[in-house]
């Protein structure tokens, strides 16, 4: 797909915001798993959060790769981040 410089800049911004939110959720989930283990919560609850954590790790990698591609395309089209 071809995007204008303005569209790419906006896509980078939106993707960065989404990535930051996902990273924050990932850190919160990691912390919650530790708390659950200390409290000796039921194993199914820990397993559910562990599965969610693993999903978030994959999502962070995908979003980071997308952001890198968008930023590279933006820069190659002569865009600059302010």
Model-derived features: positions:
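Glycine-centered signal
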Residues: 3, 34, 38, 65-67
């Amino acid at each position: 797909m071809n995007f204008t410089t303005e569209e790419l800049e906006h896509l980078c911004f939106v993707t960065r915001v989404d990535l930051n939110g996902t990273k924050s959720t990932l850190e919160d989930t990691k912390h919650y798993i530790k708390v659950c283990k200390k409290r000796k919560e039921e194993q199914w609850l820990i397993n559910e959060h562990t599965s969610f954590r693993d999903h978030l790790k994959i999502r962070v990698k995908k979003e980071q790769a997308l952001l890198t591609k968008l930023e590279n395309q933006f820069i190659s089209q002569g865009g600059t981040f302010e």
